[in-house]
């Protein structure tokens, strides 16, 4: 966390009664994390920089490129771990420390936060934008994209819609259109999909990055074509991006 190893973790000092904002950013190249704070719950207030109705959870999953702002109520004095564990398991998690100012000499609580395994996990369906969302309606254009790759026949190629960048055809759009993107994940790995230059509506929230679960997971989003240019749309797993899982969104 913040460039520090668990053996010498970053520490954040708080005082009892404070409301503490934590800005969680996953800049990783290939790791999705489950995040929890020992002895405390988290109230999510923003995702990808956009405000949402507050929702209180015990843990959240943050994909590569995603961002969350959460507020922690400092009402449980002590020295607590803030842990980011991989979605695959709990071995060697990243760690920081939430230390109350009056807890000098107190030892860090042992073990992983209970919230990593129990309690309420944040789901995209929990997120409700406080901003006005683009009205729902029939899209002017729809792209159906199968996310696949890593197969035995060609393990070093990852594709969107059966095509690998840079040889993939652009996704052509026209200014003023409402565009819908439907993604189905044919692979065994999670894909955090990121669109440059736009925020999109994913359910009832505005985001610019959305996770597509493995093993036939599906995700859809809609956006208004209102920022002319040539924009990158890609998986934020950098290994998949490098191996072709990207397309250009091109205004025509």
Identify the meaning behind each predicted range.
Residues 44-58, 138-252:
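Active-site pocket scaffolds in enzymes
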Residues 113-142, 147-149, 153:
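Compositionally biased low-complexity segments at domain edges in trafficked proteins
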Residues 7-8, 128-131, 167:
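Glycine-rich, charged/polar anion/phosphate-binding loops
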Residues 1-121, 205-212:
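Histidine- and aromatic-rich segments of cupredoxin/plastocyanin-like copper-binding domains
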Residues 72, 82-83, 96-98, 123, ...:
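Short beta-strand element of the conserved SAM-dependent methyltransferase core
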């Amino acid at each position: 966390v913040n460039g520090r190893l668990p053996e010498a973790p970053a520490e954040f000092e708080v005082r009892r009664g404070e409301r503490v904002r934590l800005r969680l950013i996953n800049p990783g190249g290939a790791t999705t994390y489950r995040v929890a704070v020992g002895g405390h719950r988290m109230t999510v207030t923003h995702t990808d920089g956009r405000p949402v109705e507050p929702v209180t959870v015990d843990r959240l999953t943050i994909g590569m490129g995603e961002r969350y702002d959460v507020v922690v109520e400092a009402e449980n004095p002590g020295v607590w771990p803030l842990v980011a564990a991989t979605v695959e398991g709990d071995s060697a998690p990243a760690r920081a420390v939430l230390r109350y100012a009056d807890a000098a000499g107190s030892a860090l609580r042992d073990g992983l936060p209970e919230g990593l395994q129990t309690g309420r996990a944040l789901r995209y369906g929990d997120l409700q934008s406080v901003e006005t969302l683009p009205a729902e309606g029939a899209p002017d254009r729809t792209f159906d994209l199968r996310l696949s790759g890593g197969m035995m026949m060609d393990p070093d190629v990852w594709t969107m819609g059966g095509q690998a960048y840079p040889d993939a055809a652009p996704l052509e759009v026209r200014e003023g259109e409402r565009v819908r993107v439907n993604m189905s994940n044919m692979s065994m790995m999670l894909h955090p999909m990121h669109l440059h230059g736009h925020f999109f509506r994913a359910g009832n929230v505005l985001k610019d990055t959305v996770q597509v679960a493995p093993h036939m997971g599906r995700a859809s989003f809609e956006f208004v074509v209102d920022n002319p240019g040539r924009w990158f749309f890609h998986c934020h797993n950098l290994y998949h991006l490098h191996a072709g899982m990207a397309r250009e969104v091109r205004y025509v």
